[in-house]
Amino acid sequence: TLVAFHGCPLRCKYCLNPTSLQPDGVWERYDCNQLYEEVRKDELYFLASCGGVTFGGGEPLLQNEFIRQFRQLCGPEWRITVETSLNVPLQNVEELISIVDNYIVDIKDMNNDIYQRYTGKGNERVLCNLRYLIEEGKAGKIIIRTPLIPSYNTEKDVDYSIELLKEMGITQFDRFTYKTP
């Protein structure tokens, strides 16, 4: 089950979920109890498949208190995954490290110039947070999304990013090409 949060620190040129950036839109607001009641309809499936909830966005690591409260409701049997840019303060990652089971990290590109041109921000926080997760033994719980973004990076750039990430200890990648307008 995917839960999308509103708000993101990045302004990617081809945002895959631009409604998460809109100040108004068609959003259903849930508190933790309401969300739990809604998604627990799938609990038998979660337990049989080792599944759970993926928090995406926007940026889920800007919603730490909500995720912490949700974990208390669902217990340790459900897997909690965050689909994140990791472009948040380190403290946000530290606060949830014992709560989050898996990470899907949209790295964009390891080259800071490419990353900044595409997102409007530098990738220093991303790399710091990624190193922290690896140091804490989470490398096997991380899938890195390494997109080819037309007009921003090349196949060579993606290859180089993957090589650098492998050197850091990452083994799981989701390589794909953005469909651009």
Question: What positions do the PLM features span?
Answer:
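Flexible, glycine- and charge-enriched loops at secondary-structure boundaries
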Residues: G25-C32, T119-N123
